[in-house]
Amino acid sequence: MSADSRIAAITARIVERSKPYREPYLDRVRSAATNGPHRTVLGCGNLAHGFAVCSPAEKVALAGDRVPNLGIITSYNDMLSAHQPFETYPALIREAAHEAGGVAQVAGGVPAMCDGVTQGQPGMELSLFSRDVIAMAAGIGLSHNMFDAAVYLGVCDKIVPGLAIAALTFGHLPAVFIPAGPMTTGLPNDEKAKVRQLFAEGKVGRDELLEAESKSYHGPGTCTFYGTANSNQMLMEIMGFHLPGASFINPGTPLRDALTREATKRALAITALGNEFTPAGEMIDERSIVNGVVGLHATGGSTNHTMHLVAMARAAGIVLTWQDISELSDLVPLLARVYPNGLADVNHFHAAGGMGFLIAQLLRKGLLHDDVRTVYGQGLSAYAIDVKLGENGSVKREPAPEASADPKVLATVDRPFQHTGGLKMLSGNIGKAVIKISAVKPESHVIEAPAKIFNDQAELNAAFKAGKLEGDFVAVVRFQGPKANGMPELHKLTTVLGILQDRGQKVAILTDGRMSGASGKVPAAIHVTPEAKEGGPIARIQEGDIVRIDAINGKVEVLVEDIALKTRVPAHIDLSDNEFGMGRELFAPFRQIAGAADRGGSVLFH
């Protein structure tokens, strides 16, 4: 089925806007594919260094250009639960590559930080910038020009977007993303959130809180709520970087290993040495990007992807805007209720029908482009499947079920949870912002209240502990943008403001910083641009000004006369405390040149 005419029109607009960037990008991709990799043109010393530790048979294979070599880019470390399973993947990939007549080498490793560990800590100010560092680190690994395709091992928040930027920068190479899968279900996410609120209110101690957190985050795999990490997995599948059904299979299971083997063999099959050459830069086009945005809306995915998708698209010469994302939200229904948008976790989502059911439903209404290339072949309809373990450890795929196994978790396109998507763009005299409404109750979709000004999240937490946060208000938390301090997530404020909300106060957040993909019930107009450090209007808001956040009509404004607002002197604060410690001094150049939030907040693209 062809895409809905409205989806097609938005896609066509993106195509037209992107031409000055996309066409030169494709020229570079095709030139690189023609000129390399050709290991036989490497000097003998170069090549000897490249395969020094390989077996004699592998050296013979790599000395020519007829046996494909996979470059593995891994983000393994054993602190991140989602990345710990990758420890065994290189050996499994090498074995599968050998079975298929190829070779695989670890081309390089990239850093992988856990936002759950750094939340509310100085290290969080490196989080967004780590995405671009990951892209650059992967680029260094692939720069050896020894590889015919790359497989990318990554899961968490900034890691997958960074790896995707690298994959598209090396767009002449086929790219297959291989996930680790979610951890098994532990303490329900809503119960964990309740204990956090009780701790913030002083009603339980640290021991009780740590016990609850440990029962929630308890083993290998991705955190089970639907935050940025699991939104990453959805995106990689719906954009065609994953194999069908690969995203949400638990680690350490026979099916997980079978999918990893299959992904390896598929990566070898789509190199230029075979008959299905699928370079990543040509595979991912404007239709693929739109499919990613549609999936984000249909699942109530992470707000972080309003930045990451913009940066990922730009790496492929595609110019995606917040306006595109917002207009698509008006067309795409919400089909998933996964915490923080509901009580279920991603394991429940998968059991209800998962990605296969979701894709089938969206295709049926023409809300996705089916005519795309993927690592699995031509057409997204091949992803409308249910994946199982077949005989002899193979992967078996069947058509996705027509009915959801749990309508409270996964809805049909004819009976959605809401008729529009989970994310909206806001604009007004404060600038532009993004809001996630899928987890916010309808009565909180419009908030009009006096501003309380905070220049960091510590000030707000101190005011809460001092009992100073009374009545209705909008917490304006500013100087949190890319140029100010790297644009940290302010997720810990959700607990504090959630307590006030439960007491009957109408509260909201307005910030040039970010919120976690796990953030939920408190309305938050985030990613405000221009940011306060750049003298944006958010720096002109004063204590007591009435701020209106209207998610229904897409407005964010301070109710002050335009002339009065423009003549105010923007606030300036001393940010020197944010410049040192926990590695922040290393990122001073990044803060100086970082782009605006609506352009991806990147140092790579402006």
From Swiss-Prot:
Asked if the Swiss-Prot or TrEMBL record annotates the protein with the keyword 4Fe-4S, the reply is yes
Required cofactor names: [4Fe-4S] cluster
Q: In which pathway does it act?
A: Carbohydrate metabolism; Entner-Doudoroff pathway
Recorded GO molecular functions are:
4 iron, 4 sulfur cluster binding; metal ion binding; phosphogluconate dehydratase activity
**Record's keyword terms, sorted:** 4Fe-4S, Carbohydrate metabolism, Gluconate utilization, Iron, Iron-sulfur, Lyase, Metal-binding
Cofactor details (free text): Binds 1 [4Fe-4S] cluster.
Entry annotated with the keyword Iron-sulfur: yes
Its UniProt entry gives the catalysed reaction(s) as: 6-phospho-D-gluconate = 2-dehydro-3-deoxy-6-phospho-D-gluconate + H2O
Binding positions for [4Fe-4S] cluster?
Answer: 156, 223
The signal peptide stretch is: none
What Enzyme Commission number(s) does the record list for this chain?
A: 4.2.1.12
Name a GO CC annotation attached to this entry. Answer: cytosol
PROSITE patterns attached here? ILVD_EDD_1, ILVD_EDD_2
Biological processes annotated in GO: D-gluconate metabolic process; Entner-Doudoroff pathway through 6-phosphogluconate
Q: What does this protein do?
A: Catalyzes the dehydration of 6-phospho-D-gluconate to 2-dehydro-3-deoxy-6-phospho-D-gluconate.
Family of this protein: Belongs to the IlvD/Edd family.
Q: What is this protein called?
A: Phosphogluconate dehydratase
The lineage, from the top, is: Bacteria, Pseudomonadati, Pseudomonadota, Alphaproteobacteria, Hyphomicrobiales
As recorded in Swiss-Prot or TrEMBL, the protein's gene is named edd
